[in-house]
Amino acid sequence: MAEDSGEGIYRAMVEDKDGLPVLGLAAVKLGVRPGVDIVPDQQGMVHRPHFRPGDANGLSCSPTIQDLPPFAIPIEWGGSNPRTVVWRIEPTDLGAELVAQEDTAPQSKGRHISIGPSGAMPFDEYLRAVQATRSKWTKVTNC
């Protein structure tokens, strides 16, 4: 567990029995939803996003805890989710297949980061790369 140390890559997710994020295709699990979080082409490939605000650029994250969406933040931290924990990952822990970049909309109330594929790859390979980061996410204990 780690204390919040300012900016980084944060995501609120459900904790599994083993103390790591739950894998799955949902907004509060470690995974990406095809057609929602990223859009595969007709051949099932995903590509490095342009990181345009509002586009489906990949795994949705935030640069600070305060920028996480209220529906995902744990109740005890002032959010509305009774099941989530706040997690942090270092950009260097993403691996060569993934890239993170801020893609905040100009008039947005909160800032946003997406973790997308670093190049062209089949969707399933991208999903595996995201889920392979599971052990790299650390729980944040104080905000």
Protein language model features and the residues they cover:
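NAD-dependent ADP-ribosyltransferases
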Residues: 1-143
